[in-house]
Amino acid sequence: MLKKYSVQKYKNPYNLCYCLHWIFINFAIVKKNLKKMITFSVSIILLIVGYLVYGKFAERVFKPDSNAATPAYTKNDGVDYMPLPTWKIFMIQFLNIAGLGPIFGAILGAQFGTAAYIWIVVGCIFIGAFHDYFSGMISLREGGANLPDIIGKYLGNTTKQVMRVFTVILLVLVGVVFVSQPAGILDRITPEWMNNTFWIIVIFAYYLIATLLPIDKVIGKIYPLFAFSLIFMALGVLFMIFKQGISLPEITDGIASIHPQKEVTPIFPIMCITIACGAISGFHATQSPLMARCLKNEKLGRPVFYGAMILEGIMAMIWAAAAIWYYKEKGYGETQASIVYFITETWMGKVGSVLAMLGVVFAPITSGDTALRSARLILADFLKIDQTKISKRLMVSLPIFAITALIIVYSLSDAAGFNVIWRYFGWSNQALSVFTLWAITVYMVINHKPWVMAFVPAVYMTLVCSTYLFVAPECFGLGGSLPYILGGACACASIIIFANWIKKDNQR
């Protein structure tokens, strides 16, 4: 009787012994398979170490004050400024900055081979997470100031006005891009009467509601749930990468592009534009002020701003590795959404594929609504329109939504319209990071901090964006070495301008 009871107890999946046995077996499999993916495994570890070491160093450089009153209390209006739990802020920040970037961008970027690993790790730790942390913390110190105001304070009023227009355009493009994609996916997986137009209207209506209501009513309640599903999906894929033991390329094999059109898509600078959200994205600096207005303490900035970006980098690394496996097995013919669905269904079954599609649908929607919310706040600050009353919020929001709707109509009427919008969105996204990094550099000089931390990333991203303008087919499309010479000249010009400013500042 005792023997029978023990066997039945062992077979019960809820039994501790069974669970420990399952963990031991799978751990042994994972340990054995690690030899096939050393570069990938080391990259994940480096991202975590980057948060613990360089993130801590960045925090010490900024010197957050735990006793300082934050805008969540000093400007509490019950709409955009209010204290929220730290875990909620982290989840909202993560979902705001993620969107489809660390999934679709990483899948596209995987076509550049092991170079994608290097860019995600180095870019995320030293450029992207640093950019997100300092832009968020400067906003916090400036009373929750939005990005154009921060740029204006440190780069001048003319730059401020240009960046105000540029930022609103970028945010509207984010809203457009992140309406079209989820609507198209929902169109394919729902009944026929729920067509693309139907879902665009539904998503648009949600955008309007989420943009107008106080941040704790919609965003504060549902975003953490969506963030959990996105993280769960990534962890599931990560576990299956290790369990399946897929063979991934190593850096020791050399850095070579596996892009099907590698003749016209060089690793530099195309990859640095393609993989944005997993490494560095200017859009993030428009979102950090939203959460800076809800932080209870300056000390919480590192886990929220730096930590959310590191998590996004890990997610990008996971999807890049999964995509490399997919390209080796199936080739390059499918869309990014189809690749996500195939990988999750193959590795995680029906439940995994459902979670994946939820992530692919809801991640861009949640980035889109906060983008339009940011656009409303920037426009309201410029027009000096108080946003406490919903009627005033509606007055500012309607023109933004009207312009967004017109661009969506264009993207649907022209077969190539969406691709054009996406390419220019990608470049403008990274161009925004250039201005943000230069503003951070000036801030660090003025406040006697080690400004080289921001200066080197600022020069590099200037080089990336300017070279892309000259080399990309949708821009000037110049061949040979000329694009790189011109891009280098632009980067050198930025250094000379900065050096002259330093000289004048020292004289003052």
Regions found by a protein language model. Name each.
Residues G175-I201, A210-T211, L230-I258, Y443-W451, ...:
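Hydrophobic alpha-helical segments and their helix-loop junctions in multi-pass secondary transporters
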Residues K160-Q161, T197-I201, G307-A316, A323-G331, ...:
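Loop-to-transmembrane helix boundary motifs in multi-pass membrane proteins
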Residues G136, I241-T252, K299, Y306-F342, ...:
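Extracellular/periplasmic helix-exit of transmembrane alpha-helices
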Residues N33-L34, L46-I103, I270, N297-L300:
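Membrane-interface "cap" regions at the ends of multi-pass membrane proteins
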Residues L46-L47, F94, I127-G143, L147-L212, ...:
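Helix-loop-helix module between adjacent transmembrane segments
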Residues M37-G55, G109-S139, P148, S353, ...:
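Extracellular loop-to-transmembrane helix junctions
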Residues K56-M82, G105-G109, T114, F130-T159, ...:
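Flexible loop linkers connecting adjacent transmembrane helices
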Residues L84-G101, L238-I246, I255-W319, L358-S367:
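Hydrophobic, membrane-embedded alpha-helices of multi-pass small-molecule transporters
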